[in-house]
Amino acid sequence: MKIGKRILLGLVAVCALFLGIIYLWGYKFNIYLVPPSPQKYVRVALKNMDELGLFTDSKEWVETKKKTIEETSNAKNYAETIPFLQKAIKVAGGKHSFIEHEEDISKRSMTKYIKPKAEIEGNTLILTIPEFTGNDSQASDYANFLESSLHKNNYNGVIVDLRGNRGGDLSPMVLGLSPLLPDGTLFTYVDKSSHSKPVELQNGEINSGGSSTKISDNKKIKKAPIAVLIDNNTGSSGELTALCFEGIPNVKFLGSDSAGYTSANQTVYLYDGSTLQITSAFVKDRTNNIYKNFPISPDIQTNNAKSSAIEWIKSQIK
């Protein structure tokens, strides 16, 4: 009987410990014993912003946290807190940070998949690289279309057209273009504590954490001049794709300044299904230039990027 009581007490103690851990730390995994109040919801969101945001060491952030708690103290539901949290996340993470509602996430998942394009003009291969949002099958289709276009066509130079590419999943874009990129570090994420995480390309695979995609042929294409086209609608992952080409000798950037969302967001799920998209790292290119949501400036500023790129490629052919 005594042994049974000890076992029972032990189980009770373990359960109490487990429940205590969930109570104290469950928010990190979006696990709750009971639905959080709107005020708890706000505190959890602010704590995540505090831990991850790039600008949370500032006096402005300290004041913003206090003000946000005060402004939401009488909120009756989660929806009433969102406008205040939207303001707060911009202070914590900068302009690239935002809150995405569950319905917006659902709409985004239904966004029509846009396939990249490949065409030959003269002796130049022109690749149009749209933003990517889609499933793993579409990611594979996207990446392998670009890869096969690079390996199956005859051309003297390549135009990588990233104009209008606002981002999405980085992996299929970079993997599709990987025959043009040297293996090794493409760029590096740098957080507010100066910790670095390189994004690397090796043997047709990338460690960016996006779609699980592989290409059929990772043979490198060398020496071909590459023109990268950007404009003010090239943003986020579109810009990071462009930065993968920075510092490569046979590359020239043409067009206009990019959108200036050169940073990385981390996703945190909230209780109601909304997500915090918190900017947690800036980007360092292979030449050690650090982009803190700065735009990429092209080597050649032009309103006629495509025709200028074709002329530049012609000038590089010997």
Curated annotation (Swiss-Prot):
Q: Name one Pfam family in it.
A: Peptidase_S41
Q: Does the keyword Lyase apply?
A: no
Which Gene Ontology BP annotations are present? proteolysis; response to antibiotic
Judging by the UniProt lineage, the source's domain of life is: Bacteria
Q: What membrane topology is annotated for this entry?
A: Single-pass membrane protein
Q: Membrane spanning segments where?
A: 7-28
Q: Where in the cell is it found?
A: Cell membrane
**Major localisation:** membrane
Q: Which GO terms describe its cellular component?
A: plasma membrane
Query: What keywords appear on the UniProt entry?
Result: Antibiotic resistance, Cell membrane, Membrane, Transmembrane, Transmembrane helix
User: Which molecular function terms from Gene Ontology are attached?
Assistant: serine-type peptidase activity
Q: What is this protein called?
A: Nisin-resistance protein
Q: What gene name is listed for this protein? A: nsr
